[in-house]
């Protein structure tokens, strides 16, 4: 018994749902008929709806309306509204694919989800640029001043890519300047006057990587400084007095006479 009562309740609920859908369809069909006629008063809307629902024994008005719907069905805007929406969506997606290329392949699903979550209202269509700027961060902003949106979008992408290249160039230049500063600190002013080619710079970097701090500039040893302080300019004058290769023969002849005169004092 309990199962039978439960089944009856389910049937009543299902029947009420079907009745509501039938009533909605009947009212919509009768509205289409009255819209199609030149004089909407020729068909009684209430009588047509009741005949469609089966609450009146006569079906004269409903039969007339049904014939009219079958003849002029493609002309009704309600029938074509779904097709129009689908075609408009396809056209929009095709245009976006043309404008932004692979960008829509990568982020198209995200933008479609955003459109489904936040649909644009009719009163917001006039301010479409502001809505797109808020939604997509200004990247998909429409330019209302110029008509060629494709050219504008391509210019925008070129500017974005150009800024990326400029940033990469700036970072590369900054790294090169930092390397130059390090080289100038390490080698003093010796490397400033040299204008090297990129190939020489690469070779210098390889040498630096290979030998590390071995190539750093090293000062004179302490014993050389003490030696220089002790003997002063005597060594310079002695080096200047040494003969060249051309004067070697004459000097070899004069050496015995000097040794006879000064003995072993001039030996070094």
Curated annotation (Swiss-Prot):
Places the protein is found: Cytoplasmic vesicle, Secretory vesicle, Chromaffin granule lumen; Secreted
InterPro entries according to UniProt: Opioid_neupept, Proenkphlin_A
Matches recorded under PROSITE patterns: OPIOIDS_PRECURSOR (PS01252)
One BP annotation, GO: response to nicotine
GO cellular component: axon terminus; cell body fiber; chromaffin granule lumen; dendrite; extracellular region; neuronal dense core vesicle lumen; perikaryon; symmetric synapse
Keywords attached to this entry: Cleavage on pair of basic residues, Cytoplasmic vesicle, Disulfide bond, Endorphin, Neuropeptide, Opioid peptide, Phosphoprotein, Secreted, Signal
Positions carrying Phosphoserine: 252
Domain of life: Eukaryota
Entry keyword Hydrolase: no
N-terminal signal peptide: 1-24
Disulfide bond entries: 26-48, 30-52, 33-65
UniProt record similarity statement: Belongs to the opioid neuropeptide precursor family.
Name under which the protein is recorded: Proenkephalin-A
Gene encoding the protein: Penk
């Amino acid at each position: 018994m309990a199962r039978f009562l439960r089944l009856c309740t389910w049937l009543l609920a299902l029947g009420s749902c079907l009745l509501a859908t039938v009533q909605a369809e009947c009212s919509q069909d009768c509205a289409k008929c009255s819209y199609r006629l030149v004089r909407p008063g020729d068909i009684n809307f209430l009588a047509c709806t009741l005949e469609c629902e089966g609450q009146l024994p006569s079906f004269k008005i409903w039969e007339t309306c049904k014939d009219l719907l079958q003849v002029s069905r493609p002309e009704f805007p309600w029938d074509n509204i779904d097709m129009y929406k689908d075609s408009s969506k396809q056209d929009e997606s095709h245009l976006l694919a043309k404008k932004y290329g692979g960008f829509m392949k990568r982020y198209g699903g995200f933008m479609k989800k955003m459109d489904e979550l936040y649909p644009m209202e009719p009163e917001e269509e006039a301010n479409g640029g502001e809505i797109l700027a808020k939604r997509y961060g200004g990247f998909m902003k429409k330019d209302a001043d110029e008509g060629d949106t494709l050219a504008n979008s391509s210019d925008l992408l070129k500017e974005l890519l150009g800024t990326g290249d400029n940033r990469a160039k700036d970072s590369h230049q900054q790294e090169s300047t930092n390397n130059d500063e390090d080289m100038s600190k390490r080698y003093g002013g010796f490397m400033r006057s040299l204008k090297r080619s990129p190939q020489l710079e690469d070779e210098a970097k390889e040498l630096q990587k290979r030998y590390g701090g071995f190539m750093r500039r090293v000062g004179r040893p302490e014993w050389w400084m003490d030696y220089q302080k002790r003997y002063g300019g005597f060594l310079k004058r002695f080096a200047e007095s040494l003969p060249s290769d051309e004067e070697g023969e004459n000097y070899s002849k004069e050496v015995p006479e000097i040794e006879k005169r000064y003995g072993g004092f001039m030996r070094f």
